[in-house]
């Protein structure tokens, strides 16, 4: 095999895309900072038990594992940043009140999430710790939408809402082994009514009927009224439905944005403890942004604080945005002529891009559009349009 061939689903980022990614990274972090979120930078490598705290089997399977040559302990390359941020909140910051934290860095996956996906996403996220109320849920969702808007995505956005408490409440008190539970979850996600009917035949009536009803409970806000009738009698379900209705109302009416509900959406079921959302945009094969409430994530660190947040892959975000135009630049000769270096330094200090053409070469730069040049006229260096 050639030495230049990279592993499957791993790719270099070339100049034009790299510039776009970096500009978006800065825009996203600045948007989060505008909400009061503080930047943290956890390490890429960490002890395995910290990386897999309260995250379920899926993240375990996605994590690259190795042995530390210094200590002999099992370590992992992070597949998700949230457990690390939970550790920072619990033990390093150790604040009593609300902590707003954001991050942006690479994660590594053993397998791609879907066909053609990278195994090295650049994950951006924002999280609130310390507030259990719906206000925190609303803020992170509004921030996620503002991040997309800052990136240039505002039309055709679909916000899909669900709540993990609904399915948990329907399973409460039902003796079912892990294998059957996994099959029920798969049937709900696939909206497979016949499979779900067979699997729940022996369940108590309330759980059986409620789970079977879920496969039909998706669509616009009217779904919540239908769910209130079909799933009545469970306080946890009533609270979840009321929260979803209030959350949707908090977003307000926007003709460029659609709000939908899918009460059988169980992605991240082992991870989320309450409200969860996905944001879909034109051109993306799946949800571009995912988030929700995960109050149990800090339990392993001895400080189980309320937590809610979201994340997205910046590289995937770039893929659904139009290519950005080349940056305008000034072409300058490579020379020891008097005043040239001072003129170039002054232009760069003023924010201009100045590309010096090396002897024997023309302007071969793909990333910049040299629409001006620096020329000498009457003993002075001046910028002239090309």
UniProtKB/Swiss-Prot annotation:
Superkingdom, natural source: Bacteria
Which GO terms of the cellular component aspect does the record hold? cytoplasm
Where it sits in the cell: the answer is: Cytoplasm
Any idea which UniProt keywords this protein has? Answer: Amino-acid biosynthesis, Cytoplasm, Histidine biosynthesis
Q: What positions belong to coiled-coil segments?
A: none
What terms describe the molecular function in GO for this protein? histidine-tRNA ligase activity
Q: Which SUPFAM superfamilies has this protein been placed in?
A: Class II aaRS and biotin synthetases
HAMAP family, alphabetized? HisZ
**Oligomeric form and interacting partners:** Heteromultimer composed of HisG and HisZ subunits.
| Further details from the record | This function is generally fulfilled by the C-terminal part of HisG, which is missing in some bacteria such as this one.
Q: Can you tell me which family this protein belongs to? A: Belongs to the class-II aminoacyl-tRNA synthetase family. HisZ subfamily.
Q: What does this protein do?
A: Required for the first step of histidine biosynthesis. May allow the feedback regulation of ATP phosphoribosyltransferase activity by histidine.
The protein's name is: ATP phosphoribosyltransferase regulatory subunit
Source organism per entry reads Variovorax paradoxus (strain S110)
Gene (name only): hisZ
